[in-house]
Amino acid sequence: MNSVLALIAGAILPLAFAPFNWFPIAFVSPAILLAVWLRSRPLVAWWRGWLFGFGFFGAGASWVYVSIHHFGNANVPLAVLITVLFVFVLALFIAFQGLSFSLFFRKRKAALTALFAFPAWWVVWEWLRSILFTGFPWLFLGYSQINSPLKGFGPLFGIYGISLIVAFISGCIYLLVTSKKLNKKIMCLILIILPFIVGWVLTFIPWTRPGSESVRVGLVQGNIGQRLKWDPDTLYSTLHTYYSETQKNWDHGIIVWPEAAIPIYPQQVSVFLQALDKEAKQHNTALMTGIPIYHEKTNKVFNGLMVLGDGHGLYLKRHLVPFGESFTSSKICNLLMKYFDIPMSDLSPGPEDQEPTVVKGIPFAPFICYEIAYPTEVLNHLSNKQFIVVVNDDSWFAGTIAPAQQLQIAQMRALETERYLLYSTNTGITAIISPEGKIVKSAPQNQRLLLTGQIKPVTGKTPLMRWNYYPVVGIIIIFLLLTFL
């Protein structure tokens, strides 16, 4: 029965995230897992943790099937097998989280374990999942709270801090249900309610300073299917799509085209780029576009973002998607690359230190696709940037919940840094996000259009930008020490 309960608890947890946003589930589901683990010996806790993880990632991340089958040319059985293996491996993180939790904490006092060990250990394993095997920083508990009062903790403690608070509340819920004394139940209720009150108050504190002048922006959503996009015969049509939407809107100060909007090297469309750059300068418009970059001297290809017109800079994507944008040099990986025939699947990562990207005299932080999901990497490269730009192409996962999940992640990055964030995608969800992490405007998916809005450059730093995650690390250490009192 406990094993079935663990599986169900994991399977319902994705409902707490976008596009469903039933955020209270994020407190209940881990509380159920905690109850199961506290009744399990180490190996049993491993198994039940794996079941929870299989349900969680099976329901929340199985969208990889779409890209493997529809765009990787894998037949249905093979695509299903790869998807199951993907979910199987992800579930191992929670399995070993359960094993170690049971080994270290099961015999400690239940109250201390629930209040301190459980939330601290949960965040430790979220962090491990973000760095091991290139990382999969997806579906962290804290993302589910982007629309709850707990979002107020975002500028202070970031995603890991909010995850810590969510898991802490889960521990309180477990104690509320299992405690027999009224005074303990009342204390648990107070501990559950208090973070929401504090978080709500924190939402009224501005940590940064928006500029006085607004900049009009336009995000072009080309809505070009993957197969058409990479077909050489449709190159002219693709370029015309983006140019025609731009030509009608040169009155915008900033125009953004999505990831690989120009699906060909700059050397091959130099005349087009020169003309586009000249026209943008004539209208005092900064135009940025995703484009693959080929370095002839090194024979390397990069996923890039180029700035034209009233601005300058070229950004090369640093953190590549494993097996989507990069393969190791092993023979097996080379065979996989040839079999799946994925466009731009043998890229090189850009250098850590790159020239600043600037539009209309405003420095901004560019990120491409998957990079926005790495909390510490975003912080490390933000520095004095005054807004954030993310270019993406979620058509790889068309018809799934992945685009909504990634947009929610982008909302958290905007909230953590209190910067406007321009989220430009090929097929949607294109959006403009406020420094409060709210979606100011968004475009419907699978439509060709230009999303317009206004942003303000932001100066100053949030506490998270100043301190990084050191306070959260300190709290985790204290929590773990308290467990052994």
From Swiss-Prot:
Keyword terms of this UniProt record: Acyltransferase, Cell inner membrane, Cell membrane, Membrane, Transferase, Transmembrane, Transmembrane helix
Membrane-topology annotation of the record: Multi-pass membrane protein
Coiled-coil segments: none
GO cellular component: plasma membrane
InterPro entries assigned: Apolipo_AcylTrfase (IPR004563), C-N_Hydrolase (IPR003010), C-N_Hydrolase_sf (IPR036526), LNT_N (IPR045378)
CN hydrolase domain boundaries: 220-457
GO molecular function (one): N-acyltransferase activity
Pathway per the UniProt entry: Protein modification; lipoprotein biosynthesis (N-acyl transfer)
Segments crossing the lipid bilayer: 8-28, 49-69, 76-96, 121-141, 157-177, 186-206, 464-484
PROSITE patterns to which the protein is assigned, alphabetical: CN_HYDROLASE
Physiological role: Catalyzes the phospholipid dependent N-acylation of the N-terminal cysteine of apolipoprotein, the last step in lipoprotein maturation.
Protein name, entry field: Apolipoprotein N-acyltransferase
